[in-house]
Every structure is written in structure tokens, then in C-alpha cells.
């Protein structure tokens, strides 16, 4: 790939914020020094001792936008408004870029929380209503709503690393472009100011009684809301469309603190690693940075850690570096914070200005000396800017921007992405934590009867639950007390994958190994504790510890802390595709970036009481103990729910022997493919082309259909389109017939496929339904050396992964 093809530029932007709706109003407020922090919130604040927040002005929005409707959560409605502006300003229409070549990568910390709260606070006996709002609450469903509204039919990724979400999203969006999976990516983030988030930060004592004053007094944050989106394109494509780039995205970096669930590492080491990674990725030195846009929440912990990180990266030059935070204007917009502040930075750079730190009056004595104090932007022309974001769970992200797109061409080219291998794998499911291959070959379903005594609503007759896992015995030094179920599953799976790889995490290697996780929903244990505290004591006295655990990346952050994984981190809220999304994204990060030597990738899913009740509502007669349910059946469905986790250790092939000298790779990542919900065949085609093989070279296919007619048909239609008549000669496997159909099934499917590569044999489908033209019994024509893993979902899109024996 040429230098110009790799260069990533920004061709459109859109903003919805408390200071203004649309770029013009947004910048006018910044230029005039107006804050969006005010007292007009959409909920009563009499029970609190703080009454301020940066809420959207209803008069500036389309009528009824924040009310939502039966199909769309209010957060999605706000995101659509910002994303539409970005696309319009980029000149993107169906006539300029094909819908299936448009991708979306959206970040959110609490997307869908309005709907999840409605679910939690609705009488359990209102089963139909609860099902509707639970289905609408998925984070990936918000991304789907934006994509559907704007005609985006390419890959869809949802990133949820709390307040770093939209900054992480930019990095994943760039990787999609570099691998040719899209011609343009709409990327950004959204979050709304609802009482749950306001009350949560209030319970933590984090909110200032006056408008936020980063690095100044009073100490504390102001909660905000909004959405921001960018259009990313390759420079060549933008020029071909005669679009003038607004800026260039030069470098991205991320890291994990491994310190605390909510507080940043006070030494600034974690933030510094992300900053250095972004600078290295950009090929820019600290001395070339002319402006730093800080996360700058206004809390003592964040502001001090960020300043110490700057001192570590910039040395003595940190004293002279212009620094500002936009939180005084916008409040803390959570998952939208990074992208809205990037938009403000680009708008300022275009005008030869730097945005100020609104509200700064008095230094706390330990912060950047040059905080661009005052209300009016400063005149200054800078070539490069650096942006930082930090979050609950210890997640950090950073990006380097250039005001002139010509600077993007100076990046050192990777002529061919690095080869990636898998060093270790694990699975935690109804079979336990070992013996997956044997359990799948026995062919006996692992679900058992569900005890419905005491439940106010019907529960399904059977489910495939994970048996007790001795985490403290399996992972030395890890205390499972205080961990919720999802965290225990993910931590166990990640630890077992590292052990299978023979990888010992210690010394400087801790900073070079990271975690990319997938998840379908908030952790049920912690969510129950959070809303139970609201029901028992009211919003103003809710549980602060439970609030800190209802961010989607809480389990990933806890696993990273427990296992000392301090390298790049991300959380893909991909619903049923979370596992495959995590593996595909991790493979792209290793292939295209240089800030990690290895990544643990995988996903976890749990069967909370609410999921069991919802499944019983949708499939009241599904499953009997020891009786398999039909997968890929043509005319009936009776799926059984399961749960579990699976993780994999990915590394560059060139460094695998140095990382794990006693273990050989167990698989090679030959190709990945991502596409929209109607494009599973397209995703498979991407993977085949990346692997440089034909359909005839595939020895086995592992599907992730959950037993519903729709999911089965989506996989079968795509397979017939790609393989044609030859499909009858290729065994099709699916572990749901033994382990149950969990929302994290695509990760468990990948683990099963790796076992097929280890043994050379595909697995049978228990009680295989009669499907003419398909080889469902697992018999192979010969040793399984190449396996295709697939998954598709109407909201999350489609994914394909090709693995080969090493």
C-alpha cells in the first residue's frame, strides 16, 4: 500500500453539544467563551447538593428528539443528528460512495442506558414491554440505528471504553480503512446526561457545585452530553472525490493503567504510554507537538495524572507546551468527549487558533503552566496537535492530528501488514474450563433444568450454565471476591489462554501485552446491584461501587489489572459478534500498529436472571434436559441459552518465538472480514482474499447461528452464495448444540475451531437437523488445516475469520 493510500484524512465533521447544535453554533460558542454548563436538566435535582450539568438545549433540537420512540433510544437519535451533519459536510451520498463501502465505528459509555433503565424500572410482569426496551438497550443497537438511518451498509463496530470510547473508535476506524474494508468510515461517539449517570458521579463525590474548571478551582467535574462524528477517508479517495481534507489523523495509541477501577494511575505512567504510542505511530516527536488537548475533567485525580504524564513524555518542554481542556465549555460528555474535543481542536487549527481552558482562574500548583487561560481562543498556528482521553477501567487513548493533510504522507509505510498467529486459546462454558474438545465430541448437550422457584415470571426449562470455577486456584494472586460473574468469566478465560500460550507476564512485557475484549451487555450482577440500590434508596443515594461497574469495559479493566496487561486495550460492544470483533480488531492492531507485541482477545457473556426471563418470553418451550435443539433447521426453532467466555493470545509471527520460546503457535490468522448485516458473504470474501485462498481450500466451517430461523438462514444463504454446490462436501460445525447459544457464542465458536485445527478433525453437531446440501456430521475429507469461522447479526453486522494450522 502506498504512502498516499495509507494516509488517513478527515473530510467531514458534525457536532451536537450543550453549547450548540451543528458545527457553526458549536464553534461560535467556543469563540465567544460561552459555557454549556447550566441548571436546566431534564430531571429534578432537589435531592442533590449539585444542580448543574451541560445538557442539550431542547430549543436547538428537532421537536421530540430526546423523547425517543418505540424503536430508537434517545442516544441514537442524537447520534444520527451529528453523524448526518458529518456525512453532508463530507459530501457523502449514495451516488458518491456505495452503501456497503461505508462503515461506522461508534463509541459510547452509556449508549442505550435510557432503555436499560426503562427495562429495570418496569414491572417484571410487563413481559412484552420489558422485552422491547431490553432489545433496544444494546450498545450495538444504537450503532445499528445510526447506520440504518443514514444508509451505512458496511462494517459496524461499537466501542465502549467508558470516557475514552470515541477516541478509541478513531483508531479502529483508521484500521478499517488501512485494510481496505471500507472506503469511508463515519466514526465518533454519543452519550446523554440522564439521572443514572448524574447520580452515579454525584455518589462518587466527583461533581463540582460550580461549572467545571479544569486544572483550577473549584475541583470537580460537570457532567455533559452530546455527540460528535468525523468522516475518515484515505487521502487518495478524498482527492478522487475532490474533497478538501479538514485535517489528518496521523497516529493512534492506547494503554491500560492496571491501577484502579475508577481512578487513574497517579504516576501518569499509563497515560504516558498511550501518548508515546500515538506519537510513535505518527512518526512525530514530542518537540513537534504545538498543542495538547487534555482530557482535563477537573477532578484532582485526573488532572494530576495527566500533568505527570505530560512531564514524562515532554520532559522540560512540558513547561512551555500550550494545553487546554474543553470540559469548561462542554462538561464531561463521557463517550463523546474525545471526538467533540477533537472537532474543537480541528476547528481551532483551521483558524490559526487554540481553544482556551474556560473557567481557569487559579492554578492548583501542580499542572501545566500554559493552560491558555481566559475565555477567548489564542492566536497560534501549530502543525501537530496531540489529544488524550482516559476512562474508568484504566483505559487510555491518544491521537495525533495534523492541520495540513500533506503531513499525512510522511508516515512510514508498512508495505505488507505483519503476519499474526495465535499462541494460546481457552474456553469457559457449560463444560467447565478444560476439555472443550472432548465435550464437543461426546455430543451430549450440557444444559440442565432451571430452578424457577421464587421467580415472579416464567423461566426457560433448561439452560447451559457455567459450573463453579476455582479462579483463585487457577490464577495465582487473583482474589475473586468482589468480582461480578462477567469479570470472573473473562479473567479466567484470559488467564487460561496466557497459560496455554506459555506466556509469563512480568517486567517490561506487561506494557507490551494488552487486552481487546468483546461483550454483549452490561454485567448483570453489577447492573442488578445498581438498580436495586435505586429501587431501595432512590437515585440520590444509589450505590457508588455498583455505578463504577456498569460501564461496559469494567470487566475488561478488572481482568487487565488482575493479569498485569498494561498494553493497548479496547472493548467491542458487538452483541453476538463481540468475540469475532475482538479477534479481528486485535489482529488488525497487531498487523498495522507497533504498540504491542501480543494481545489477549476474546469475549464473555453471562446468563443473568433478566436474560433467562426474556428468553422464556421469546421461546417458552425451548429445550429439554439432555435433548439437543435444532440448529440450521429449515422450519422450526427451539434454542437453549448458554453462557461463557473464550480468549486467545495473538502475536506477530516474527516475535512469537521470543515471547513464548517453549510453545509453537497453534494457528495462523490467515484473513479477517467485516461487513454489514446483509453482507456475510462479503465478509467471507474479504477473509478469503486476505488469505489468498479459494473456497475450495476451506476444510471446515464453524458457524455461530443461535438456533433461530433467522440466524440459521443468514449463515446458510451466505455459505451457499460463496461455496455453491461444494458446500455439501465441507463439514459445518456449531458448538451451540452442546454449549447452548450464548450472546458470546462467536468467541466460543472460535475456540472450538481452534480445537479442530489442533486435532485435525471437525466437531459434530448434536442432533443435527436435516439440511439438504450440507455436511453437518463433522466428518472431514482430510485433516482440517484451514477453518472458516462466521457470525452475522441484524444489528451488529457480519464477520468472518480464517484460521490455518501453523
Language-model segments: which ranges?
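Conserved "HGTGT" condensation-loop signature of ketosynthase/thiolase-family condensing enzymes
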Residues: 1-155, 175, 194, 200-222, ...
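Short loop-beta-helix segment that forms the pyridoxal 5′-phosphate
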Residues: 155-161, 568-573
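Glycine-rich, Trp-frequent "lid" loop and neighboring beta-strands that shape
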Residues: 163, 572-576, 595
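Active-site histidine-anchored catalytic micro-motif
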Residues: 169
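Short glycine/serine-rich loop segments
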Residues: 173-193, 590
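Short, well-structured beta-strand segments enriched in hydrophobic/aromatic residues
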Residues: 184-188, 598-604
